[in-house]
Amino acid sequence: MDSDSHSDSQIKEFYQLKNIAVVGVSKNDEKPSHQVPKYLIEHGYNIIPVNPTLTEVLGRKAYPSITDIPDKIDIVDVFRRSEDIPAVLDDALKRKKDEIKVFWMQSGIYNQEAERKAKENGIDVVYNRCMMEEHRRLFADEE
């Protein structure tokens, strides 16, 4: 599976956004869906966990859906199967217009229809990339 066509400088720009809703976050510390948000917290990002089966994870309140989050969201980072992506995007699109800047599908995740719909709504789309791996790769010299 290919990745999106964003340049490194574009991806670096996305990391200036600090409020990240992580959909599909896990309390299992062996899963990437736990390790990635933990890493992002350690690097100064405001992680907002989204998982309907959790009330708290990583020391933060978890929300059942993106639509339940009262705070601002800049990026939606998704750890769900590709076929679940359209429903996640639909929830994201229920937020205030122009609030969400980036819809990020983690490594191995892609849905063409969701990509098209997000772009039509002015949201940048990143897919088949890990937020932790990309951060490490792009900012390694700054750590």
Regions from the PLM with identified roles:
Residues S26-K31, P37-L58:
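NAD(P)-binding Rossmann-fold cofactor-contacting core
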Residues Q16-N19, I100:
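Phosphate-coordination loops involved in phosphoryl transfer and adenosine-cofactor binding
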Residues R95-A118:
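ADP-ribose/adenylate-binding Rossmann-like module
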Residues A21-V23:
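Conserved beta-strand elements of the Class I
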Residues M1-H6, V57-D71, V78-L89:
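Glycine-rich, highly charged phosphate/nucleotide-binding loops
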Residues P52-L54, S107-Y110, R129-E134:
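Short, acidic/turn-prone active-site loops that include or flank metal/cofactor-
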Residues V57-R60, D74, E113, E134-D141:
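Short, charged, surface-exposed secondary-structure boundary motifs
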Residues G122-E143:
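Active-site capping/gating segments
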